[in-house]
């Protein structure tokens, strides 16, 4: 009887994560991650430029489009990069077989990254691999044409990835200073990808008190659109709160907000000195910034190398609704603000025309007012107190149809002068006062002048008693029409006719 002794076959069950660098920017990001010593992932580099591909620090390289580009690059034409990736589609699939998660990193706006990244994402999606895209947008000084190519490439890539993270290169100016070198600035952008990948690998490598597995990552990141990944560290007092705030506030990411996140994965990592209150403080600091209905998955792990340091990693996804809500109201507010401006400028145009005749009437009224106030100042308060109560109701109905322009002109002075009384009542009460006083005042000198003119000489007495020059002008105007049919010459003619005619006839 033969006895065979053999070691039991054990299969290592752990997720396989691949970082796929596409184009020149993607290859540089992979090289920086390899130099940083990131472990637990596989690195693959694909490029149409054979010369640039030789500088890759990984042995897994793919020459895209050998027949199409012949290793000379895509020439900043995305359609060339797309055709090159389609030519190398089988080789791309070989590197993706067996992977559970793939990070596709590229720089948008060029030829290879813009055109080939969507094809690689499509290949990964066909195999059911959790696909995350981490791409950069060009600087503003690179021109609008390159920015339009980047936007179209991002839209095409978003069709095939589960989660997309966009890093505008222009945001590097938020963290860079005068001494920041060009290489260091791009290293900051690559750090976003590095921290995001490390936050995923730490979940599966480090022992967790509150364990998180790859299934939780898939739940948070599958079919979630725009995402935000950040990692923050803190030391000293309030280190947990500082780490949480640094993880959320990443100035390099595109304009996204945690308010609209549908799913959030939070992992707090620290040394053996990490306390329960610190874990609670870090978790609450992030949950307060998220919608209460969001799916929050929390985990905590220990890392002996982080003695005195707390690290918080956040993966928030599903923020397309928040970004759209921030963009849509802007053009609406401009249209709303522009509409009243057009209406306001068109309305006051006819107003200055009626304002001119009113100025003429107002200029004529002050000439009549001194006549009213000079002889009789006392009867005015009696008219103000008694007249406006019964008269305004009747005058409102008569003045509105006949005079349409008076309420507009009288409304302006009523606001500044009359503060206690209703301006509508004041306008009605003020209008009949002046014509009534002028009416009676014009009648009185006419009666006196007509009465004294019958006897003669009374006109001179009235003119001597009047002291105001304006009253003399008023009496002169009323007396002049009566001086034209002068009766005195008629009496003289009568005397001339009576004396010679009667005397001669009687004498004869």
Swiss-Prot record:
The keyword GTP-binding applies. GO terms for molecular function: GTP binding; GTPase activity. Keywords: Cell cycle, Cell division, Cytoplasm, GTP-binding, Nucleotide-binding, Septation. InterPro entries: Cell_div_FtsZ, Cell_div_FtsZ_CS, FtsZ/CetZ, FtsZ_C, Tub_FtsZ_C, Tubulin/FtsZ-like_C, Tubulin/FtsZ_2-layer-sand-dom, Tubulin/FtsZ_GTPase_sf. Residues 342-389, 428-508 are annotated as: Disordered. It is found in: Cytoplasm. GO terms for biological process: division septum assembly; FtsZ-dependent cytokinesis; protein polymerization. Residues 464-482 have a biased composition (Low complexity). The keyword Cell cycle applies. One of its GO terms (cellular component) is cell division site. GTP binds at residues 24-28, 111-113, 142, 146, 190. PANTHER family: CELL DIVISION PROTEIN FTSZ-RELATED (PTHR30314), MITOCHONDRIAL DIVISION PROTEIN FSZA (PTHR30314:SF3). Essential cell division protein that forms a contractile ring structure (Z ring) at the future cell division site. The regulation of the ring assembly controls the timing and the location of cell division. One of the functions of the FtsZ ring is to recruit other cell division proteins to the septum to produce a new cell wall between the dividing cells. Binds GTP and shows GTPase activity. HAMAP family: FtsZ (MF_00909). Homodimer. Polymerizes to form a dynamic ring structure in a strictly GTP-dependent manner. Interacts directly with several other division proteins. Belongs to the FtsZ family. This is Cell division protein FtsZ.
């Amino acid at each position: 009887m033969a006895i065979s002794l053999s070691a039991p076959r054990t299969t290592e069950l752990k997720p396989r994560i691949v970082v796929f660098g596409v184009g020149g920017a993607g290859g540089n990001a992979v090289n920086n991650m390899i130099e940083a010593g990131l472990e637990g992932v596989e690195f693959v580099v694909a490029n149409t430029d054979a010369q640039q591909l030789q500088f890759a620090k990984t042995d897994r390289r793919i020459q895209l489009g050998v027949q199409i580009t012949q290793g000379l690059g895509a020439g900043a034409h995305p359609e060339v990069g797309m055709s090159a990736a389609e030519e190398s589609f089988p080789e791309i699939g070989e590197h993706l077989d067996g992977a559970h998660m793939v990070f596709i990193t590229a720089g948008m706006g060029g030829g290879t990254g813009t055109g080939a990244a969507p094809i690689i994402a499509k290949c990964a999606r066909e195999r059911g691999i959790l696909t995350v895209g981490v791409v950069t947008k060009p600087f503003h000084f690179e021109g609008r044409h390159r920015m339009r190519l980047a936007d179209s490439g991002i839209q095409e890539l978003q069709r095939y990835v589960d989660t997309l993270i966009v890093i505008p290169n222009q945001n590097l100016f938020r963290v860079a200073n005068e001494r920041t070198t060009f290489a260091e600035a791009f290293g900051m952008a690559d750090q976003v990808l590095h921290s995001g990948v490390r936050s995923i690998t730490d979940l599966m490598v480090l022992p967790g008190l509150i364990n998180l597995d790859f299934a939780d990552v898939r739940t948070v990141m599958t079919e979630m659109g725009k995402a935000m990944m950040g990692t923050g560290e803190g030391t000293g007092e309030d280190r947990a709160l500082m780490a949480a705030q640094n993880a959320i506030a990443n100035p390099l990411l595109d304009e996204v907000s945690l308010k609209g996140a549908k799913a959030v994965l939070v992992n707090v990592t620290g040394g053996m000195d990490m306390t329960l209150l610190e874990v609670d403080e870090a978790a609450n600091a992030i949950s307060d910034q998220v919608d209460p209905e969001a799916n929050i998955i929390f985990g905590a792990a220990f890392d002996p190398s982080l003695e005195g340091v707390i690290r918080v990693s956040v993966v928030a996804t599903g923020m397309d609704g928040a970004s759209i809500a921030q963009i849509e109201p802007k053009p609406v507010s401009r249209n709303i603000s522009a509409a009243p401006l057009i209406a306001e400028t068109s309305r006051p145009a006819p107003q200055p025309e009626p304002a001119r005749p009113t100025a003429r009437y107002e200029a004529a009224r002050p000439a009549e007012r001194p006549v009213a106030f000079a002889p009789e100042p006392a009867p005015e308060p009696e008219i103000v107190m008694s007249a406006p109560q019964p008269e305004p109701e009747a005058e409102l109905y008569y003045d509105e149809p006949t005079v349409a322009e008076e309420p507009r002109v009288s409304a302006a002075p009523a606001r500044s002068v009359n503060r206690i009384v209703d301006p509508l009542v004041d306008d009605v009460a003020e209008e009949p006062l002046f014509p009534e006083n002028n009416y009676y005042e014009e009648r009185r000198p006419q009666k006196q002048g007509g009465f004294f003119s019958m006897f003669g000489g009374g006109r001179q007495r009235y003119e001597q008693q009047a002291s105001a020059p304006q009253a003399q002008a008023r009496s002169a105007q009323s007396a002049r029409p009566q001086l034209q049919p002068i009766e005195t010459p008629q009496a003289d003619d009568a005397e001339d006719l009576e004396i010679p005619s009667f005397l001669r006839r009687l004498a004869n």
